[in-house]
Amino acid sequence: MVLFLLLVALLSPAGEAGKIIGGHEAKPHSRPYMAFLQIKISGKSYRCGGFLVHEDFVLTAAHCLGSSISVTLGAHNIVDRERTQQVIQVRRAIPHPHYNDKTLANDIMLLQLTRKAEMSDAVSPINLPRSLEKVKPGMMCSVAGWGQLGVNMPSADKLQEVNLEVQSEEECIARFKNYIPITQICAGDSTKRKNSFSGDSGGPLVCNGVAQGIVSYGKDDGTTPDVYTRISSFLSWIQRTMRRY
């Protein structure tokens, strides 16, 4: 089974990206940190997720890099012009310097916005973990996005969310040859048809109100568990990069 970047359908026409598998529609604006990314690559449009971590920085996956990126904050229905929405262009995309597009190691990227987002009930940053904070197997977390409901399914207009259980490292070590426990998180119960999928790339894995992971990759059949970039392993890089710019 080939690995499936949770943006691969993203890197085909945007209409092929869809929504969360086995989840439900989120309460509008209950996740004010969520960002919808419209990406341009070779003249075509693709999509990813992301999340606001500072008034002018969004965190996402490095494999969501494109020639230009537009960020929509404060959205629930991405096809409507909701009064809460703020559309901001990206001034600078900064993928991790050791990102490997073959193994997806260090799949993390900061996006500096061209202007500061205006804080509101629908737009506010999410907390990042403490440096020594670690998620443990059995912990319940959640992921949200405008990604895919299933293989070859249409895209979601409204934000979807799903609860996921953190799995043991052994689950993903056995499932993915390039899984790295120090910098990645394994999440999604293999007995349940619930997970993030194509189009959800770059969105946050949220545990107890804290962004602990970033949607990275999984299998192309939509089965679980999937792999998430472990944010706590990159805190010094995140802080150093935001200070630099």
Curated annotation (Swiss-Prot):
Classification via InterPro entries: Peptidase_S1_PA, Peptidase_S1_PA_chymotrypsin, Peptidase_S1A, Trypsin_dom, TRYPSIN_HIS, TRYPSIN_SER
An example Gene Ontology CC term for this record: extracellular region
Keyword terms of this UniProt record: Disulfide bond, Hydrolase, Protease, Secreted, Serine protease, Signal, Zymogen
The EC number(s) this enzyme carries: 3.4.21.-
GO biological process: proteolysis
Broad class of where this protein is predominantly found: secreted
Top enzyme category: hydrolase
Tissue expression: Mucosal mast cells.
Molecular function terms, GO-annotated: serine-type endopeptidase activity
Keyword Protease among record annotations: yes
Catalytic residues as annotated in Swiss-Prot or TrEMBL: H63 (charge relay system), D107 (charge relay system), S201 (charge relay system)
Recorded superkingdom: Eukaryota
Prodomain residues: 18-19
Residues in the signal sequence: 1-17
SMART domains reported for this sequence: Tryp_SPc
Cysteines engaged in disulfide bonds, as pairs: C48-C64, C141-C207, C172-C186
Record-linked CDD domains: Tryp_SPc
Residues in Peptidase S1 domain copies: 20-243
Function: Has a chymotrypsin-like and trypsin-like activity.
Family: Belongs to the peptidase S1 family. Granzyme subfamily.
Protein name per the record: Mast cell protease 1A
Upper classification of the organism: Eukaryota, Metazoa, Chordata, Craniata, Vertebrata
